[in-house]
Amino acid sequence: MTPRTPALVAALAAMALGTAHAQTCTEPHYRWSEKVDTSFATQPPAAVDVSDMLTWMPRTITATDKCARRIGRERNVYAVTAFVRRIKLHEADGDWHVEITEEEYTPAPASCIIVEIPAPAYGNIYRQARDQLAGLVDTTHLAANGDLDAPVEVTFTGAAFFDGYHQKQSSTGKHASQHGRCNSSLSALWELHPIYDVTAPVGP
């Protein structure tokens, strides 16, 4: 055995583990187990503003990281109070896709983030969260594109999630793409997903 053999064996083992992990990734959608995870629901939330989230450092993961686990900030729960601007109720993965902004009438593409509520099939807590949102926003009278007639202020509580699926590489560098209207920066790919609780905001 040469002096380099142990290092070579370790490198080959690491490659094998990585390959095995890639081969066993059977998620039906991007990072699906993380998106429907209820294990953080009892964690006390930290208050955060949309403007704060738009400064968070993006993760490096992309669409190829279909089974990436939660790390760092993604293991924390936050409560954000913001104005609901658009709700899409019929996404392919069954989530309720909600676009929110910190201010009532700021242009959404320049200032929005997304929060998402999974289908009730993944936990009764999501049925409750959808019922809570429907009690604050009339989800039966949305525009064809999901827009509200007038923004409604709501507090959403959920786990932070970086949607690296929409982090794209081009000749000019990395950028956000096709993340609803919320593509102002890579930091706009931060979401609260899943949402565990939806309430009316507490007064000043």
Label the model's feature ranges.
Residues 23-204:
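OB-fold and OB-like single-stranded nucleic-acid-recognition modules
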Residues 1-9:
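Bacterial N-terminal signal peptides that target proteins for export
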